[in-house]
């Protein structure tokens, strides 16, 4: 799982808008925006949240720490 803070941080690191994330992950922009309005772990469809996480990882994002206690995000530039 990933937290709302991690989603926002990953988007910022990649310079993506919510619409760009939605397009790349194959979900609606309304879904991304709805998730980002929440706190902690989004109350979300697991399949959709997994698609978002996997798309970030394809672009060099690594999610670190516990998403609720010490959420972290690292961008690996190798291969991009």
Q: Where in this protein do the model-derived segments appear?
A:
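A short, Lys/Arg-rich alpha-helix, primarily the initiator
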Residues: 1-12
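Residue-level detection of the helix-turn-helix DNA-binding "recognition helix"
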Residues: 12, 26, 37
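Short alpha-helical DNA-recognition segment
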Residues: 17-34
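Residue-level "edge-of-site" marker
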Residues: 24, 45, 69
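Short, charge-rich, low-complexity interaction segments located
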Residues: 36-47
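DNA major-groove recognition helix of helix-turn-helix/homeodomain DNA-binding modules
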Residues: 46-63
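Helix-turn-helix/homeodomain-like alpha-helical modules used for DNA recognition
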Residues: 61-80
């Amino acid at each position: 799982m990933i937290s709302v803070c991690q989603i926002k941080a990953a988007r910022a690191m990649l310079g993506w808008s919510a619409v760009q994330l939605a397009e790349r992950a194959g979900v609606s922009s309304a879904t991304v925006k709805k998730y980002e309005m929440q706190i902690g772990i989004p109350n979300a469809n697991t399949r959709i949240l997994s698609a978002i996480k996997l798309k970030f990882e394809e672009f060099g994002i690594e999610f670190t720490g516990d998403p609720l206690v010490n959420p972290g995000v690292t961008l690996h530039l190798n291969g991009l």
